[in-house]
């Protein structure tokens, strides 16, 4: 039993000195494992007399319990120390300033489209869309553009085949709307359009928004008032607006819309080519032939239509002088919006 006391004290000292869980496990195996020093004493009980065995067995079990309890206590301390060390290594210094997230932004053309839609939605217009590959009838014939019209030429239009084109305007959406809905109609038709043209102010693909109003007793005065109020709302300024007589095969009478130059306030500059005015779109009263082709009675209803280039409006609103910047995906340009 003297050997038992020495082994117990030795085991307890090693437990107390164990610096990590691996060292602690090694102590347990050495003293309480199947071949451990204290476990081996139990195997020697057979050499004692029957009278001595119970007392000796009780002493050995008491020693085992003492060592096991010390092991458990030390294990808890070491585990907690490991957790504390891990937490200390992963601590977040809340006094540091936060790092801002680099979020994306909307493209200026998208911003412009959304702004146009919001302005017209506020006065009761709905948004209509249509196919970008359009048939000859809806892109030309139904809009009073006969086969001999210059717009049909290959140098102006992208032809997919003999009877289909990449739409040259969103006016076909107006025709489809009149075919499928009965007046009164108040819609705008935004979307991509395609033309054989490319320079600083033109792109083979660009965005256009057209509008259509059909009802009884619609007049040119309604058109002028609508466009005047829209342009003032869009540019957030009391910009002077003028209408110049023009020609479009699908409207009669027709007009071009100009606003006073936003750069020189009408005095004349390089942007407006010294005229003091900037063109923003075309408009007019819907031609009776377009009504007939769309199934609307021109004797009962009248209407007006207008069309504007979205990139053109974006250029004027944001002061951009080259249309191609909108399509180059240059972050130095896009981050400004």
UniProtKB/Swiss-Prot annotation:
Xref: Gene3D superfamilies: Bira Bifunctional Protein, Domain 2
GO BP: phenylalanyl-tRNA aminoacylation
Gene Ontology, cellular component aspect: cytoplasm
Stored CDD domains: PheRS_alpha_core
Record keywords, A-Z: Aminoacyl-tRNA synthetase, ATP-binding, Cytoplasm, Ligase, Magnesium, Metal-binding, Nucleotide-binding, Protein biosynthesis
Protein family per UniProt: Belongs to the class-II aminoacyl-tRNA synthetase family. Phe-tRNA synthetase alpha subunit type 1 subfamily.
Cofactor info, note text: Binds 2 magnesium ions per tetramer.
EC number: 6.1.1.20
Descriptive protein name: Phenylalanine--tRNA ligase alpha subunit
Positions with a binding annotation for Mg(2+): 252
Recorded catalytic activity of this chain's protein: tRNA(Phe) + L-phenylalanine + ATP = L-phenylalanyl-tRNA(Phe) + AMP + diphosphate + H(+)
Main localization (coarse): cytoplasm
InterPro entries reported in the protein's UniProt record: aa-tRNA-synth_II, aa-tRNA-synth_II/BPL/LPL, Phe-tRNA-synth_IIc_asu, Phe-tRNA_ligase_II_N, Phe_tRNA_ligase_alpha1_bac, Phenylalanyl-tRNA_Synthase, tRNA-bd_arm
Subunit structure: Tetramer of two alpha and two beta subunits.
Name of the encoding gene: pheS
GO molecular function, one term: tRNA binding
Compartments where located: Cytoplasm
Swiss-Prot/TrEMBL cofactor(s): Mg(2+)
Record organism: Cellvibrio japonicus (strain Ueda107) (Pseudomonas fluorescens subsp. cellulosa)
């Amino acid at each position: 039993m003297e050997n038992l006391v020495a082994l117990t004290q030795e085991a307890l000292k090693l437990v107390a000195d164990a610096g990590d869980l691996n060292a602690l496990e090694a102590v347990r195996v050495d003293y309480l494992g199947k071949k451990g020093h204290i476990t081996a004493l139990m195997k020697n009980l057979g050499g004692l007399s029957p009278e001595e065995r119970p007392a000796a067995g009780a002493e050995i079990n008491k020693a085992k319990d003492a060592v096991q309890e010390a092991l458990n206590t030390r294990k808890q301390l070491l585990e907690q120390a490991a957790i504390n060390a891990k937490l200390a290594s992963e601590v977040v210094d809340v006094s540091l300033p936060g790092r801002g997230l680099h979020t994306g932004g909307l493209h200026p053309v998208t911003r412009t489209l959304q702004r146009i839609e919001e302005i017209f939605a506020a006065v009761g217009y709905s948004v209509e869309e249509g196919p970008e590959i359009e048939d000859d009838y809806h892109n030309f014939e139904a809009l009073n553009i006969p086969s001999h019209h210059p717009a049909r030429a290959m140098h102006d239009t992208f032809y997919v085949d003999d009877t289909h084109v990449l739409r040259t305007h969103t006016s076909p959406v107006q025709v489809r709307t009149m075919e499928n809905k009965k007046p009164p109609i108040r819609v705008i038709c935004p979307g991509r359009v395609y033309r054989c043209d490319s320079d600083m102010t033109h792109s083979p693909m660009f965005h256009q928004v057209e509008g259509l109003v059909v009802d009884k007793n619609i007049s040119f005065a309604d058109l002028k008032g609508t466009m005047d109020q829209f342009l003032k709302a869009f540019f957030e300024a009391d910009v002077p607006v003028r209408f110049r007589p023009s020609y479009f095969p699908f409207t009669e009478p027709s007009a071009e819309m100009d606003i006073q130059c936003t750069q020189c306030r009408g005095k004349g500059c390089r942007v407006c080519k010294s005229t003091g005015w900037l063109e923003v779109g075309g408009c007019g009263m819907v031609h009776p032939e377009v009504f007939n082709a769309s199934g609307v009675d021109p004797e009962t209803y009248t209407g007006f239509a207008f069309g504007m280039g979205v990139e053109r409006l974006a250029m004027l609103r944001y002061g951009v002088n080259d249309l191609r910047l909108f399509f180059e995906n240059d972050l130095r340009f896009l981050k400004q919006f």
